[in-house]
A protein has these predicted regions:
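Membrane-proximal intracellular helices of multi-pass ion channels
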Residues: 3, 7-213
Length: 213
Protein backbone atom coordinates (compact mmCIF):
# COMPACT_ATOMS: atom_id res chain seq x y z
CA UNK A 1 0.00 0.00 0.00
CA UNK A 2 2.79 2.40 0.92
CA UNK A 3 4.49 1.66 -2.38
CA UNK A 4 1.25 2.34 -4.25
CA UNK A 5 0.70 5.57 -2.36
CA UNK A 6 4.26 6.61 -3.08
CA UNK A 7 3.86 5.79 -6.76
CA UNK A 8 0.61 7.72 -6.96
CA UNK A 9 2.24 10.72 -5.28
CA UNK A 10 5.16 10.58 -7.70
CA UNK A 11 2.84 10.37 -10.69
CA UNK A 12 0.69 13.19 -9.35
CA UNK A 13 3.71 15.40 -8.68
CA UNK A 14 5.12 14.57 -12.10
CA UNK A 15 1.82 15.43 -13.80
CA UNK A 16 1.65 18.71 -11.90
CA UNK A 17 5.13 19.62 -13.06
CA UNK A 18 4.26 18.74 -16.65
CA UNK A 19 1.10 20.85 -16.52
CA UNK A 20 2.98 23.69 -14.86
CA UNK A 21 5.63 23.61 -17.56
CA UNK A 22 3.00 23.51 -20.30
CA UNK A 23 1.14 26.54 -19.01
CA UNK A 24 4.29 28.27 -17.73
CA UNK A 25 2.73 28.95 -14.35
CA UNK A 26 4.62 29.20 -11.07
CA UNK A 27 1.61 28.03 -9.08
CA UNK A 28 -1.06 25.53 -10.10
CA UNK A 29 -3.55 27.47 -7.97
CA UNK A 30 -3.44 30.18 -10.63
CA UNK A 31 -4.21 27.75 -13.44
CA UNK A 32 -7.38 29.55 -14.55
CA UNK A 33 -5.70 32.94 -14.76
CA UNK A 34 -2.79 31.33 -16.59
CA UNK A 35 -5.12 29.73 -19.13
CA UNK A 36 -6.79 33.11 -19.65
CA UNK A 37 -3.32 34.58 -20.13
CA UNK A 38 -2.59 31.94 -22.77
CA UNK A 39 -5.88 32.75 -24.50
CA UNK A 40 -5.16 36.46 -24.48
CA UNK A 41 -1.60 35.88 -25.69
CA UNK A 42 -2.87 33.70 -28.54
CA UNK A 43 -5.59 36.15 -29.57
CA UNK A 44 -3.09 39.03 -29.54
CA UNK A 45 -0.74 37.21 -31.92
CA UNK A 46 -3.56 36.13 -34.20
CA UNK A 47 -5.02 39.65 -34.21
CA UNK A 48 -1.63 41.09 -35.16
CA UNK A 49 -1.30 38.53 -37.95
CA UNK A 50 -4.82 39.29 -39.13
CA UNK A 51 -4.06 43.01 -39.25
CA UNK A 52 -0.89 42.54 -41.30
CA UNK A 53 -2.58 40.17 -43.74
CA UNK A 54 -5.52 42.57 -44.11
CA UNK A 55 -3.19 45.46 -44.93
CA UNK A 56 -1.41 43.24 -47.44
CA UNK A 57 -4.55 42.27 -49.37
CA UNK A 58 -6.76 45.33 -48.93
CA UNK A 59 -8.11 46.45 -52.29
CA UNK A 60 -6.10 43.90 -54.29
CA UNK A 61 -8.20 40.73 -54.39
CA UNK A 62 -11.62 41.95 -55.57
CA UNK A 63 -13.18 41.39 -52.14
CA UNK A 64 -15.39 43.51 -49.94
CA UNK A 65 -13.89 44.78 -46.70
CA UNK A 66 -15.90 42.20 -44.77
CA UNK A 67 -14.57 39.42 -47.00
CA UNK A 68 -11.02 40.74 -46.59
CA UNK A 69 -11.40 40.74 -42.80
CA UNK A 70 -12.82 37.21 -42.85
CA UNK A 71 -10.02 36.02 -45.14
CA UNK A 72 -7.38 37.63 -42.91
CA UNK A 73 -8.84 36.23 -39.69
CA UNK A 74 -9.25 32.72 -41.08
CA UNK A 75 -5.71 32.48 -42.46
CA UNK A 76 -4.14 34.03 -39.36
CA UNK A 77 -5.87 31.51 -37.08
CA UNK A 78 -5.19 28.63 -39.47
CA UNK A 79 -1.49 29.52 -39.63
CA UNK A 80 -0.94 30.04 -35.89
CA UNK A 81 -2.81 26.83 -35.05
CA UNK A 82 -0.72 25.01 -37.70
CA UNK A 83 -3.90 23.82 -39.40
CA UNK A 84 -2.85 24.76 -42.91
CA UNK A 85 -6.35 25.34 -44.30
CA UNK A 86 -7.05 28.02 -46.92
CA UNK A 87 -10.32 29.32 -48.33
CA UNK A 88 -8.80 29.80 -51.78
CA UNK A 89 -9.04 27.23 -54.59
CA UNK A 90 -5.55 25.81 -55.03
CA UNK A 91 -4.61 26.88 -51.51
CA UNK A 92 -2.05 29.71 -51.37
CA UNK A 93 -0.87 28.85 -54.86
CA UNK A 94 -3.94 30.67 -56.17
CA UNK A 95 -3.17 33.38 -58.73
CA UNK A 96 -4.95 35.96 -56.54
CA UNK A 97 -2.11 35.84 -54.00
CA UNK A 98 0.85 34.43 -55.92
CA UNK A 99 1.94 37.79 -57.33
CA UNK A 100 2.52 40.94 -55.30
CA UNK A 101 1.53 39.47 -51.93
CA UNK A 102 4.83 38.52 -50.34
CA UNK A 103 3.62 40.11 -47.10
CA UNK A 104 0.98 37.38 -46.82
CA UNK A 105 3.50 34.56 -47.25
CA UNK A 106 5.98 36.06 -44.79
CA UNK A 107 3.28 36.78 -42.19
CA UNK A 108 1.78 33.31 -42.46
CA UNK A 109 5.26 31.78 -42.25
CA UNK A 110 6.02 33.55 -38.98
CA UNK A 111 2.58 32.70 -37.58
CA UNK A 112 3.29 29.04 -38.36
CA UNK A 113 6.66 29.28 -36.63
CA UNK A 114 5.28 31.05 -33.55
CA UNK A 115 2.41 28.60 -33.28
CA UNK A 116 4.74 25.63 -33.65
CA UNK A 117 7.44 26.46 -31.11
CA UNK A 118 5.08 26.25 -28.14
CA UNK A 119 3.63 28.61 -25.55
CA UNK A 120 6.47 28.38 -22.96
CA UNK A 121 8.94 29.46 -25.65
CA UNK A 122 6.69 32.35 -26.67
CA UNK A 123 6.41 33.52 -23.07
CA UNK A 124 10.18 33.35 -22.62
CA UNK A 125 10.64 35.38 -25.82
CA UNK A 126 8.02 37.89 -24.72
CA UNK A 127 9.62 38.29 -21.30
CA UNK A 128 13.05 38.70 -22.89
CA UNK A 129 11.90 41.33 -25.37
CA UNK A 130 9.96 43.17 -22.64
CA UNK A 131 13.00 43.17 -20.36
CA UNK A 132 15.31 44.43 -23.13
CA UNK A 133 12.89 47.24 -24.02
CA UNK A 134 12.71 48.30 -20.37
CA UNK A 135 16.49 48.09 -20.02
CA UNK A 136 17.08 50.21 -23.12
CA UNK A 137 14.45 52.70 -21.96
CA UNK A 138 16.00 53.10 -18.52
CA UNK A 139 19.61 53.01 -19.74
CA UNK A 140 19.48 55.23 -22.82
CA UNK A 141 16.31 57.30 -22.50
CA UNK A 142 16.09 57.96 -18.77
CA UNK A 143 19.84 57.75 -18.19
CA UNK A 144 19.57 55.17 -15.40
CA UNK A 145 22.82 53.16 -15.56
CA UNK A 146 22.00 50.91 -12.60
CA UNK A 147 19.77 48.49 -14.51
CA UNK A 148 22.18 45.82 -15.70
CA UNK A 149 21.53 43.26 -18.38
CA UNK A 150 20.58 39.80 -17.15
CA UNK A 151 23.01 37.09 -18.22
CA UNK A 152 20.51 34.26 -18.73
CA UNK A 153 17.51 35.67 -20.59
CA UNK A 154 16.71 32.53 -22.58
CA UNK A 155 16.24 29.19 -20.86
CA UNK A 156 17.83 26.04 -22.27
CA UNK A 157 14.61 24.82 -23.89
CA UNK A 158 14.17 28.13 -25.70
CA UNK A 159 17.74 28.12 -26.97
CA UNK A 160 17.51 24.58 -28.32
CA UNK A 161 14.16 25.18 -30.03
CA UNK A 162 15.21 28.49 -31.58
CA UNK A 163 18.56 27.19 -32.81
CA UNK A 164 17.09 24.05 -34.36
CA UNK A 165 14.20 26.01 -35.89
CA UNK A 166 16.62 28.50 -37.45
CA UNK A 167 18.85 25.73 -38.82
CA UNK A 168 15.92 23.84 -40.35
CA UNK A 169 14.46 26.98 -41.91
CA UNK A 170 17.76 28.24 -43.34
CA UNK A 171 18.80 24.86 -44.73
CA UNK A 172 15.30 24.16 -46.05
CA UNK A 173 15.05 27.56 -47.73
CA UNK A 174 18.43 27.24 -49.43
CA UNK A 175 17.74 23.68 -50.61
CA UNK A 176 14.35 24.65 -52.06
CA UNK A 177 15.84 27.68 -53.83
CA UNK A 178 18.58 25.55 -55.38
CA UNK A 179 16.18 22.83 -56.52
CA UNK A 180 13.30 25.02 -57.71
CA UNK A 181 14.98 28.21 -58.96
CA UNK A 182 14.45 27.33 -62.62
CA UNK A 183 11.68 24.79 -62.07
CA UNK A 184 8.64 25.57 -59.91
CA UNK A 185 9.89 29.15 -59.37
CA UNK A 186 10.62 29.83 -63.03
CA UNK A 187 9.33 33.23 -64.15
CA UNK A 188 9.33 34.72 -60.65
CA UNK A 189 11.49 37.62 -59.52
CA UNK A 190 14.47 36.74 -57.27
CA UNK A 191 12.64 38.24 -54.28
CA UNK A 192 9.54 36.16 -54.96
CA UNK A 193 11.67 33.03 -55.30
CA UNK A 194 13.30 33.53 -51.90
CA UNK A 195 9.96 34.32 -50.24
CA UNK A 196 8.36 31.24 -51.77
CA UNK A 197 11.32 29.11 -50.71
CA UNK A 198 11.07 30.39 -47.13
CA UNK A 199 7.31 29.83 -47.10
CA UNK A 200 7.60 26.28 -48.44
CA UNK A 201 10.41 25.50 -45.99
CA UNK A 202 8.06 26.55 -43.19
CA UNK A 203 4.96 24.75 -44.47
CA UNK A 204 5.98 21.18 -43.47
CA UNK A 205 5.00 22.26 -39.93
CA UNK A 206 1.36 22.48 -41.07
CA UNK A 207 -1.19 20.06 -42.44
CA UNK A 208 -1.96 21.74 -45.72
CA UNK A 209 -0.55 25.15 -46.68
CA UNK A 210 1.14 25.14 -50.09
CA UNK A 211 1.90 27.59 -52.87
CA UNK A 212 3.64 25.47 -55.52
CA UNK A 213 3.22 21.93 -56.74
Amino acid sequence: PLRLVGSEMCIRDSNQLVVRDMVSSQSLSSLLSTLLYILGFTLAIEAAGMGIIFLGIHGTMDMTVREELAFSAFHSISAFCNAGFSTLPGNLGNEMVMHGHNTIYITISFLIILGGIGFPILVNLYETVTYEVKRIWHHYIKGNKRMRRKIHLYNLNTRIVLIMTAILLIVGTVVIVVLEWNNAFAGMSPTDKWVQAFFNATCPRTAGFSSVG
